[in-house]
Amino acid sequence: MSSAAADHWAWLLVLSFVFGCNVLRVLLPSFSSFMSRVLQKDAEQESQMRAEIQDMKQELSTVNMMDEFARYARLERKINKMTDKLKTHVKARTAQLAKIKWVISVAFYVLQAALMISLIWKYYSVPVAVVPSKWITPLDRLVAFPTRVAGGVGITCWILVCNKVVAIVLHPFS
């Protein structure tokens, strides 16, 4: 495929990249949750701790506070200690989960920005599409920016239009 033919299909290339990035952005929360579940296996330990706390509370309900105060107090302290340990464990896991989601989001947006910058760089002086100039007469210079081709649609305008159209199309799915 020659360079001229590649430039002829630039509008489709940009549209597909924008569509792909927006679909990935919609799927990003699900992907982040999946990755955090894969990277964190602490939920089993937490459920075991919860089960132990439940067992101790059940045992505590069978102990008479008046007759066996020492045993009751010991068991109550043990429950409180285990509950505090569980709370700190959950806080640490939640913080790690937020960090994982943040890193995945930042990585995605950096890659998306790099992709858009590379598209702008490649098609900076070439119009992505050429339409009759009377179709865009009042805004022809703005739409053609940065190419300065009469009737041309510049890469920046095309990316904005593609983003808006794809966002409208994907809105029901997000």
Curated annotation (Swiss-Prot):
Residues in the Lumenal compartment per record: 1-8, 121-148
Membrane side Cytoplasmic: residue ranges: 30-99, 170-174
Record keywords, A-Z: Coiled coil, Endoplasmic reticulum, Membrane, Transmembrane, Transmembrane helix
Residues making up the signal peptide according to the UniProt record: none
Topology in the lipid bilayer: Multi-pass membrane protein
Domain of life: Eukaryota
InterPro entries: Get1, Helix_hairpin_bin_sf
Cited Pfam families: CHD5 (PF04420)
Keyword Membrane in record: yes
Entry-linked Gene3D superfamilies: Helix hairpin bin
Entry's Gene Ontology cellular component terms: endoplasmic reticulum membrane; GET complex
Summary of subunit composition and partner proteins: Component of the Golgi to ER traffic (GET) complex, which is composed of GET1/WRB, CAMLG/GET2 and GET3. Within the complex, GET1 and CAMLG form a heterotetramer which is stabilized by phosphatidylinositol binding and which binds to the GET3 homodimer. Interacts with CAMLG (via C-terminus). GET3 shows a higher affinity for CAMLG than for GET1.
Family matches, as PANTHER family: GUIDED ENTRY OF TAIL-ANCHORED PROTEINS FACTOR 1 (PTHR42650:SF1), TAIL-ANCHORED PROTEIN INSERTION RECEPTOR WRB (PTHR42650)
Functional note: Required for the post-translational delivery of tail-anchored (TA) proteins to the endoplasmic reticulum. Together with CAMLG/GET2, acts as a membrane receptor for soluble GET3/TRC40, which recognizes and selectively binds the transmembrane domain of TA proteins in the cytosol. Required to ensure correct topology and ER insertion of CAMLG.
Name recorded for this polypeptide: Guided entry of tail-anchored proteins factor 1
